[in-house]
């Protein structure tokens, strides 16, 4: 049985003996549609994706509406499966959707009740005595009655729903408040790197708003670094090029995270001004790699230095990695080898275990 449900949604109900055969048939149909050139001199791009609900046992037989709902849920999940055109429904999929809906339902309340807190992960200068000079600011969410919500779960949902703009601003202000508190207690300067999303940066008053927050707390110029990912920069190049050019005059530093995970890295660096290049661990995970692999990492570090950037290697866990990165002139390290991210209340005790950083 084949029928149109609505719009461009169709349903197929059929018996099968081999799921692999069913999938193969679907992929052949999808391939034919992809090659469809159009009608009346008009070209079209046609794609087909499918959500599949399998009835393998008597208890799998549900009402038509319930089976369609499950197939539709599987179809919606296809976009999260890179390169896939179909997905099979599973109970884990249903639980995941319910979990995400629960998170989405309490986002606004969580922001209003300030359920979020900051953790800091130290950044250590490996060229000057392994002194701690800064930290990356990471946000954590502890939901009353639930516990910790994984950042990997809630941050994409905040981005999807637009609440990431308010969350970014909250994190930035909390970071400023912490730096002001350190200053009032006579603690040494600390540079904080704060992540910002594309949606926040796209706000017309982004720099004015963040500058006003910083000035309210009297934070010195250069003590706050705005960090974005390489993927964000590649996908929104004009927006980020304009931002990076404006940051120095506003007293902010800039950093690009996950360098090397995209495809336009080297060409991009010619056109944007950055203070810090953060190297993805994929570049140096295997310090016993081939001479070619080691040469690539060293070349990136040298290139960054020639362009006036410092380099921070993320995800470092082994002493051999530290020594390799030190030997090629990498500026700093952020990783479990020195410290995991820690709550603000514990950061200063961790900081005390490192040598005092002296600028220059």
Task: Annotate each language-model stretch with its function.
Residues 1-101, 105:
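Cyclic-dinucleotide signaling modules
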Residues 12-17, 34, 55-56, 142, ...:
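Residue-level recognition of strand-loop junctions within catalytic nucleotide-signaling folds
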Residues 31-43, 178-184, 214, 355-357:
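Short catalytic/binding micro-motifs of nucleotide second-messenger systems
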Residues 56-59, 73-119, 158-162, 198-207, ...:
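C-di-GMP signaling machinery
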Residues 58, 128-136, 163-239, 315, ...:
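Catalytic core of bacterial c-di-GMP phosphodiesterases, primarily the EAL and HD-GYP domains
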Residues 144-145, 197-204, 223-238, 250-360:
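EAL-family c-di-GMP phosphodiesterase catalytic domain
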